[in-house]
């Protein structure tokens, strides 16, 4: 009985070791530069060379001025409000926070939209965007 338990324990340890070892990626042992060159997937001759060029003072100033122009144009664009053309109000319309089930007419507020919940059982006109 003890021999079978010892055999089963050894088998269990072997299976655990084999399972853990099979999930690890294989390690590559490179011995010298020749094996490194033969095993590498990227050929170093195919990569284009990179040249570093020093900038003079004039090009730095032009770059700084262009960056400042971009910053100022972005600030001006963000400060300007986009004016949306208002749709003419139709006579039969639904006020904000009132029920607006699909056969009902559109919402009176142009910034509001009909929002339904619970599988379109409860619908109401709501203003979604505060910037409108």
From Swiss-Prot:
Residues 62-85 are annotated as: Disordered. Residues 65-79 have a biased composition (Basic and acidic residues). This is Agouti-signaling protein. One of its GO terms (molecular function) is neuropeptide hormone activity. Residues 93-132 form the Agouti domain. The gene is ASIP. It is linked to Obesity and hypopigmentation: An autosomal dominant disorder characterized by early-onset obesity, overgrowth, hyperinsulinemia, and hypopigmentation of the skin. Some affected individuals experience hyperphagia and exhibit reduced energy expenditure. Widely expressed at low levels. Highly expressed in the skin. Expressed in adipose tissue.
């Amino acid at each position: 009985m003890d021999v079978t338990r010892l055999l089963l324990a050894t088998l269990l340890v072997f299976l655990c070791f084999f399972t853990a070892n099979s999930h690890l990626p294989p390690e590559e042992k490179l011995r010298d530069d020749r094996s490194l060159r033969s095993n590498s997937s990227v050929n170093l001759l195919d990569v284009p060379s990179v040249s570093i060029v020093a900038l003079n003072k004039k090009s730095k100033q032009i770059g700084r001025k262009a960056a400042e122009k971009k910053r100022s144009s972005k600030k001006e664009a963000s400060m300007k409000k986009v004016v949306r053309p208002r749709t003419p109000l139709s006579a039969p319309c639904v006020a904000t926070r009132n029920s607006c089930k699909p056969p009902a007419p559109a919402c009176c507020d142009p910034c509001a939209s009909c929002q339904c919940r619970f599988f379109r059982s409860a619908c109401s006109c709501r203003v979604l965007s505060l910037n409108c």
